[in-house]
Swiss-Prot record:
Organism: Daucus carota (Wild carrot)
Keyword Glycosyltransferase (UniProt): no
Keywords: ATP synthesis, ATP-binding, CF(1), Chloroplast, Hydrogen ion transport, Ion transport, Membrane, Nucleotide-binding, Plastid, Thylakoid, Translocase, Transport
Protein name in UniProt: ATP synthase subunit alpha, chloroplastic
EC number: 7.1.2.2
Organismal lineage: Eukaryota, Viridiplantae, Streptophyta, Embryophyta, Tracheophyta
HAMAP family from the UniProt entry: ATP_synth_alpha_bact
InterPro entries: ATP_synth_asu-like_sf (IPR023366), ATP_synth_asu_C (IPR000793), ATP_synth_asu_C_sf (IPR038376), ATP_synth_F1_a_nt-bd_dom (IPR033732), ATP_synth_F1_asu (IPR005294), ATPase_a/bsu_AS (IPR020003), ATPase_F1/V1/A1_a/bsu_N (IPR004100), ATPase_F1/V1/A1_a/bsu_N_sf (IPR036121)
Chemical reaction(s) catalysed: ATP + H2O + 4 H(+)(in) = ADP + phosphate + 5 H(+)(out)
Gene3D superfamilies reported in the protein's UniProt record: 2.40.30.20, ATP synthase alpha/beta chain, C-terminal domain, P-loop containing nucleotide triphosphate hydrolases
A Pfam match: ATP-synt_ab_C
Length: 507
């Protein structure tokens, strides 16, 4: 007969009672009233906060944007095809956040930081809010370090500094994305983390950019955030903030970052679509009233941090497309007023074969020479002045039939200077090569050459200087000054190469 031991039974019962945890969980729920066009109207959810994430019964997540007296307007982060009228919705008590880590380098992700390159999951132990506040005034310091783009026209006359926001603006097909991608390619070996955000682009265009980065080894230090044209409006609206959150992760770890937004006008269109479907009152060009805040809170996150926060930086290059050169439209004027300058690309210059098609006359950097090394300041001042005078003379020369010799010489010099600013795509130049190119042009060494020979001569001169006068590059990179010794080496190289070049051309 089995003996029942009362003490054992009572011990087991006590243990079970101790383990019992009666947790009462209050969940804020609601019911779907209607759903469609990426928008859901919810009844209930009384305690929900603006911007809070809500979860639908079938797993779709949305963001509560409109808090009205009778219902809540939610934008869906997905197609929401399985959401039914009358199904339940619960508030999560969280706002949108993404995982962040070093493992994101070299990957292509969507607006929720989920990989879309088919290379498996990305490990991350830390999270950042998609919309985190920008650094305050005390946390920042003024921009003083150059961020080299590798493009002579920009680095000499419209310099960009680390922590600056510089707008790239122009009509479609004027090479705006090419300027941005060349800047990323030029960061190789500069210890700069790059983030390229593609908003509402064609999938083929994004694939082309990624392939370009992979072929040139730029994906090692680059993250691509992509939401293509067929993505829901909510995800196109979130993509730039996701890119900024990934860049901030590195910025607050004392690193330098560069973020390209391509382009914020598509984000504004997605936000306009969401706002109109939520029945928010339309304003100018049917955009909602807070479209300025949409971009200002994004671009203000770019900063040069002070010494207390580790001196990291985030440089932002937003790209905005204009319609037939109209920079006075709503979104272009908004972004111009937020940024620290703009690089204007002209369709006329592009079609005339001047590429990159940068209109130097109306482009501006509000940081200026603070974002240049001393050597560049020494040679670039003369270039900008001579090009400005040339532009003025060229307009005048169209009406004048007989020009004096001095004017003819000035026009000839200007044409050669314009020629030296031309560069092939995906061929950024080191700052030493740029200084050498500008010096050669502004000091009249190219005046004796035909316009068609200028680029060929400069390419050969760069090669000659690298192989025969490596000290020149060493002096500039170590001292950052265009010393007398460097100038003597350069003059010598130009004269030697000019003799060789003339002999070659005669043969």
């Amino acid at each position: 007969m089995v003996t029942i031991r009362a003490d054992e039974i009572s011990k087991i019962i006590r243990e079970r009672i101790e383990e019992y945890n009666r947790e009462v969980k209050i969940v804020n729920t609601g019911t779907v009233l209607q759903v469609g066009d990426g928008i859901a109207r919810i009844h209930g959810l009384d305690e929900v906060m603006a911007g809070e994430l809500v979860e639908f019964q079938e797993g779709t997540v949305g963001i509560a944007l409109n808090l009205e007296s009778t219902n809540v307007g939610v934008v869906l982060m997905g197609d929401g095809l399985l959401i039914q009228e009358g199904s339940s919705v619960k508030a999560t008590g969280r706002i949108a956040q993404i995982p962040v880590s070093e493992a994101y380098l070299g990957r292509v992700v969507n607006a929720l930081a989920k990989p879309i390159d088919g290379r498996g999951e990305i490990s991350a132990s830390e999270y950042r809010l998609i919309e985190s506040p920008a650094p305050g005034i005390i946390s920042r310091r003024s921009v003083y370090e150059p961020l080299q783009t590798g493009l002579i026209a920009i680095d000499s006359m419209i310099p960009i500094g680390r922590g600056q926001r510089e707008l790239i603006i122009g009509d479609r097909q004027t090479g705006k994305t090419a300027v941005a991608t060349d800047t990323i390619l030029n960061q190789q070996g500069q210890n700069v983390i790059c983030v390229y955000v593609a908003i509402g682009q064609k999938a083929s265009s994004v694939a082309q950019v990624v392939t370009n980065f992979q072929e040139r080894g730029a994906m090692e230090y680059t993250i691509v955030v992509a939401e293509t044209a067929d993505s829901p409006a909510t995800l196109q609206y979130l993509a730039p903030y996701t890119g900024a959150a990934l860049a901030e992760f590195f910025m607050y770890r004392k690193r330098h970052t560069l973020i390209i937004y391509d382009d914020p006008s598509k984000q504004a269109q997605a936000y306009r679509q969401m706002s109109l479907l939520l029945r928010r009152p339309p304003g100018r060009e049917a955009y909602p009233g807070d479209v300025f805040y949409l971009h200002s809170r994004l671009l203000e996150r770019a900063a040069k941090l002070g010494s207390l926060l580790g001196e990291g930086s985030m440089t932002a290059l937003p790209i905005v497309e204009t319609q037939s050169g109209d920079v006075s439209a709503y979104i272009p004027t908004n972004v111009i007023s937020i940024t620290d300058g703009q690089i204007f690309l002209s369709a006329d210059l592009f079609n005339a074969g001047i590429r990159p098609a940068i209109n130097v006359g109306i482009s501006v950097s509000r940081v200026g020479s603070a974002a240049q090394i001393k050597a560049m300041k020494q040679v670039a001042g003369k270039l900008k002045l001579e090009l400005a005078q040339f532009a003025e003379l060229e307009a005048f020369a169209q009406f004048a039939s007989d020009l004096d010799k001095a004017t003819q010489n000035q026009l000839a010099r200007g044409q050669r200077l314009r020629e030296l600013l031309k560069q092939s795509q995906s061929a950024p130049l080191a700052v030493e090569e740029q200084i050498m190119t500008i010096y050669t042009g502004t000091n009249g060494y190219l005046d004796s050459l035909e316009i068609g020979q200028v680029r060929k001569f400069l390419v050969e001169l760069r090669t000659y200087l690298k192989t025969n006068k490596p000290q020149f590059q060493e002096i500039i990179s170590s001292t950052k000054i265009f010393t007398e010794e460097a100038e003597a080496l350069l003059k010598e190289a130009i004269q030697e190469q000019m003799e060789r070049f003339i002999l070659q051309e005669q043969v």
